[in-house]
Every structure is written in structure tokens, then in C-alpha cells.
């Protein structure tokens, strides 16, 4: 969607997945991962919270091995330990607000302050219709800095030139620092509208990167910034890693909560262990010193 009317959208590593029921051992393995690598990284609530319904994730994309690098047989043995770290992503699809919708689930868009929209969670494999409005929430338990790159994807598998859609000075004044419980929402007070001038448009490919230090090659602008395709390709090759994906059971269709609004829209708090969890967790198996890099699909109906 090149630099659309405010139509950007989410990320596109397309996972080839088969969703099936997990046996108890698989469920327990998945629970240990998201419990220790994501939930327990958040702070505990300062005041006791009402007991909530038990929740869990199902694994929908098994670990995908990173391709072997050239001359791998000649490489020296790895010294640094490789471990899994998670990045949480919730894709929200906006719909017209109904009278019964909770007030905190509603949003007035910057470009249309007369109409209210309600945010509903969708799973990462959702296929969108042209013109759908979406927002993103991203959370990283790793302390660091968040970067989000958008590219249009076409039916022949090719991609448009990359654009940095976060950070920008219009969103949080360019502050892209992340930590457990801190939610970054995109775009600031608007929504991405999925559309393109090209007939072979197939959706968006969003690349999400979490680094320990700010990227020296990136200059944050007032708005979206065009990036050098060769630079992005180098990052993707250099930080490629094995990835697993988990979906929150029963999460799709749930609306925005008061806690999510305060953390994401207002930035007045962080989420705790008692608050809602992301709809989708991406588990990246990489060396601790490497940035985390994932892609998330926003696919369109053909």
C-alpha cells in the first residue's frame, strides 16, 4: 500500500499451518512456555484482582528451523546460549459500535470523530475484506526498542518497498522503548485501512523487530519513513531465527478492555499478570544478543 491514505497493515510471514487438537502433553508444554516466557515477566497486580476464567494457548505453528548459513560446517561452535523469547501481538478489527458495547471498547478515530468504532480481537490467520480497518497492539517482555516495517504483498509473492511505520514522532513522540507489560498501539489515534491501488494486492507484510539498543541506521521522522530495501533484507538475513506461534484459546471476538485501553491508548499504566494477554504469541528461538524479528500476516480476500 505504498504510503496509503492511512491504510497500512500488518505483517506477512505466511505460516503454513494445520490446526489440530493438542494432546495433554502438548498443552502442558505450551502452558509452561507462555507462562514462564511471557506472563511471569509482567509485574503482579498491586491489589488483589477477581479470579478470572482459566486461559491457555494452542500451538498453531511449530518451530520453523532457520535456514543454514553458508559454510555452516566450517563455522566455529556457538558459544552463546540459544533460548526462546516471546513477542505478543494483538490484531484488532474495527466494526461499527453497537449500543450494548462497553464504553472502554469504543474508539473515536482521529480522521472521523463523529463515528464510534469497537475493537475486536482476531487471530493472525484472519482473512480481511478490502476496506477493513485494523489496529495493532504489541508487547515485548524483553527490555529494548521496537521497530515496525510495512510492505504490501502481491499475489505473485513479491513485496513493495519497505516503510518504517513505527516509531514516528506522531506516536508517543518517537518513544519506542518496550518492556514487559508496556503496550505499543499502532497507529496512534487512527486505524490502518486495508486498500491498494494495485489489482494484485494480497495484503500486508509487517516486520516487527525488538532490539536491545536503538538501530543506528534508522532516523525517526514525523511520519512514515521509506527504508532502503537492501538494509531491510540484510536485517532479515542476519536476524533470521526459528519461530513458533501460539493463539489464545477463546480470544477471537473479544473486545478491548479498560486495562488494555489505559495501557495502550493512554499509556497510563502497564499490564499485569491479572490483565488480558495478547491474542497471538510469537516465540523466537535466538541468541540473547540478537534482535527479535518476526513477521505477522494481514491477508486479503482474493
Predicted regions and their residues:
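Bacterial N-terminal signal peptides
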Residues: 5-16
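Secretory-pathway glycoprotein ectodomains that are cysteine- and/or Ser/Thr/Pro-rich
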Residues: 20-302
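N-terminal secretory signal peptides that target proteins for export/translocation
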Residues: 1-3
Amino acid at each position: 500500500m505504498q504510503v496509503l491514505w492511512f491504510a497500512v497493515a500488518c505483517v506477512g510471514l505466511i505460516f503454513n499451518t494445520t490446526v489440530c487438537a493438542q494432546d495433554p502433553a502438548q498443552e502442558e508444554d505450551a502452558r509452561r512456555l507462555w507462562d514462564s516466557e511471557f506472563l511471569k515477566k509482567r509485574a503482579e497486580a498491586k491489589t488483589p484482582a477477581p479470579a478470572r476464567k482459566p486461559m491457555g494457548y494452542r500451538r498453531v505453528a511449530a518451530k520453523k528451523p532457520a535456514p543454514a548459513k553458508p559454510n555452516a560446517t566450517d563455522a566455529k561452535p556457538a558459544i552463546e546460549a540459544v533460548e526462546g523469547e516471546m513477542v505478543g501481538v494483538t490484531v484488532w478489527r474495527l466494526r461499527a459500535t453497537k449500543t450494548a458495547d462497553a464504553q472502554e471498547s469504543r474508539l473515536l478515530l482521529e480522521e472521523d470523530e463523529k463515528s464510534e468504532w469497537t475493537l475486536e480481537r482476531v487471530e493472525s490467520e484472519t482473512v480481511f475484506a478490502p476496506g477493513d480497518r485494523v489496529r495493532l497492539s504489541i508487547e515485548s517482555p524483553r527490555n529494548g526498542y521496537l521497530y515496525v516495517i510495512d510492505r504490501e504483498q502481491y499475489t505473485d509473492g513479491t513485496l513493495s518497498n519497505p516503510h518504517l511505520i513505527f516509531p514516528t514522532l506522531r506516536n508517543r513522540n518517537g518513544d519506542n522503548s518496550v518492556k514487559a507489560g508496556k503496550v505499543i498501539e499502532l497507529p496512534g489515534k487512527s486505524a490502518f485501512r486495508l486498500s491498494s491501488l494495485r489489482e494484485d494486492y494480497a495484503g500486508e507484510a509487517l516486520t516487527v523487530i525488538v532490539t536491545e539498543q536503538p538501530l543506528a541506521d534508522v532516523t525517526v521522522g514525523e511520519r512514515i519513513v521509506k527504508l532502503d530495501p537492501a538494509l531491510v533484507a540484510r536485517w532479515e538475513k542476519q536476524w533470521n531465527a526459528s519461530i513458533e506461534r501460539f493463539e489464545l484459546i477463546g480470544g477471537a471476538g473479544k473486545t478491548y478492555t479498560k486495562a488494555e485501553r489505559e495501557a495502550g491508548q493512554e499509556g497510563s499504566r502497564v499490564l499485569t499478570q491479572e490483565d488480558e494477554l495478547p491474542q497471538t504469541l510469537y516465540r523466537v528461538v535466538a541468541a540473547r544478543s540478537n534482535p527479535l524479528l518476526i513477521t505477522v500476516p494481514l491477508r486479503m480476500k482474493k
